[in-house]
Curated annotation (Swiss-Prot):
Organism listed in the record: Methylobacillus flagellatus (strain ATCC 51484 / DSM 6875 / VKM B-1610 / KT)
GO molecular function, one term: large ribosomal subunit rRNA binding
NCBIfam families (UniProt xref): PRK00099.1-1
Encoding gene per record: rplJ
Gene Ontology CC, one term: ribosome
Protein name stated in the entry: Large ribosomal subunit protein uL10
Pfam families, sorted: Ribosomal_L10
InterPro entries associated with the record: Ribosomal_uL10 (IPR001790), Ribosomal_uL10-like_sf (IPR043141), Ribosomal_uL10_bac (IPR022973), Ribosomal_uL10_bac_type (IPR047865)
Length: 174
């Protein structure tokens, strides 16, 4: 079904809005993928906060033109699914995990702001921890010394209480 001019403008505006907030875009060829598998991919993308759509390449070229992702225009050839995310790693992870499970699904390219990645670059990006994982590790690292200090401070009154209990037990036994 072809789109009329107003519908095309609406799609370009919607994709432009997503691209403006994006930290990563991943392109993948979906030729030969069954509908049920694509539905699972869409559900996984939604859960990870990834905007995932099959769009006409010309419309996406217009949406990314003049942005930090304009270098991707040369890679927009063939039937592609576009994964756009605010987390630099989320789109790469979702699409790469799906590509591992489905041989017909092929990662073509990706981009971070100002940098175009090939398929290997997207795969290596997918192995990085997500922003939430990195923040959790940082928080754990920051809390560890404080928690150890609190345990050390708590040990002094605990030892004193144990000493008093031992003296009390000795006096009661005698």
């Amino acid at each position: 079904m072809s789109l009329n001019l107003e519908q095309k403008k609406a799609v370009v505006a919607e994709v432009s809005e997503q691209v403006a907030q994006a930290q990563a875009i991943v392109l993948a060829e979906y030729r030969g993928i069954e509908v049920g598998d694509m539905t699972k991919l869409r559900a996984e993308a939604r859960k990870s906060g990834v905007y995932l759509r099959v769009l006409k390449n010309t419309l996406v070229r217009r949406a990314v033109d003049g942005t930090q992702f304009s270098g991707l225009a040369n890679d927009m050839v063939g039937p592609l699914v576009f994964g756009i995310s605010a987390d630099p790693v989320a789109a790469a992870k979702v699409l790469n995990n799906f590509a591992k499970a489905n041989d017909k699904f092929v990662i073509k390219a990706g981009a971070l702001p100002g940098k175009v990645l090939d398929a290997k670059g997207v795969q290596s990006l997918a192995t990085l921890p997500s922003r939430e994982e990195l923040l959790a590790k940082l928080l754990g690292t920051m809390q560890a010394p404080v928690a150890q200090f609190v345990r050390t401070l708590n040990e002094v009154p605990t030892k004193f209480a144990r000493g008093l209990a031992a003296v009390r037990d000795q006096k009661q036994a005698a």
